[in-house]
A protein has these predicted regions:
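Short, surface-exposed amphipathic charged segments that create phosphate/polyanion-binding patches used
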Residues: 21-35
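Short acidic/histidine-rich active-site segments
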Residues: 9, 99, 151
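C-terminal accessory region of radical SAM enzymes
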Residues: 32-71, 101-149
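Short, small/polar residue-rich loop motifs at catalytic or cofactor-binding pockets
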Residues: 80-84
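Radical SAM/AdoMet-radical enzyme domain recognition
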Residues: 1-16, 20
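Radical SAM enzyme core and accessory elements
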Residues: 93, 107, 134-243
Length: 243
């Protein structure tokens, strides 16, 4: 971005697809995913890690340490850290909510409210708006779990599927970089029962891949609807797509 690898950059990964706008900004085809993985791996490997995205390099180091120490995934926290029983998200009105990225007025993607209660009645607080990675069907056997950490807990349905695909491509490049540092070899295929072929083939160079034919590209307009007004401040809901 700057041409100077000494300039630190705070983020270096995909934003989760929280809404239709995020999904539209995600990788859309298998070819897109393979191209991204090749680029991400190549830029870090080719520069010997001389990039400004320190968080990405730290993830590689962390993964290597976990492999060498035999770290058990049962101790792995969610990416956001909101599964920690000592962490609570509270808005300025004392409402206990899923996390800092949501409003107490919103409904989670699983149909449950993001409002879990109030700090005045802390004993009664109960959040049903999120799903821990250990309760999702494929996370526990995913090769990049230690890097991905389950992505976003409150996503579900199609938005979760898009986010999961993004997170896999984002992290499998780091997985390959860590593997190369550990062994001196660049992996090209990950064999795993139940792992889709486009995930087994890290860079898309080994197998033949057919794109999904049910995907159609439409011109879209992303809009946000005003859902409330609090103390003269307008509150907007999740973005929606108009075709």
């Amino acid at each position: 971005l700057t041409g100077d690898p000494e300039v630190p950059l705070g983020e270096g990964s995909f934003v989760d697809a929280y809404d239709a706008d995020g999904a539209a900004s995600s990788l859309q085809t298998k070819a897109d995913h393979f191209k991204f993985r090749q680029m991400a791996f190549g830029e870090i490997y080719g520069s010997q890690g001389n990039i400004g995205f320190a968080p990405q390099l730290n993830k590689i180091d962390m993964f290597i340490k976990q492999v060498l120490s035999g770290f058990d995934s049962k101790y792995l926290p969610q990416k956001c850290g909101m599964d920690n029983e000592n962490v609570l998200a509270v808005d300025l009105r004392g409402n206990v909510i899923t996390c800092q990225n949501v409003s107490s007025k919103e409904v989670s993607k699983n149909g449950e409210s993001h409002l879990g209660g109030t700090i005045e009645h802390i004993e009664a607080v109960e959040l049903k708006s999120s799903t821990h990675w250990s309760n999702r069907p494929n996370c526990s056997t995913c090769p990049v779990l230690q890097l991905c950490k389950g992505a976003c807990m409150f996503l579900d349905g199609d938005l979760w599927n898009v986010t999961c695909e993004n997170a896999y491509s984002d992290n499998v490049a780091l997985f390959a970089l860590a593997f190369e540092r550990l062994t001196g070899y660049i992996p090209t295929v990950i064999k795993g029962e139940g792992l889709p072929l486009h995930r087994q083939d890290i860079f898309g160079t080994v197998y033949t891949h057919v794109e999904d034919t049910n995907k159609k590209v439409f011109p879209i307009k992303v809009v946000s609807e005003k859902i409330a007004k609090i103390d003269d401040v307008e509150v907007y809901g999740q973005s929606k797509v108009q075709v």
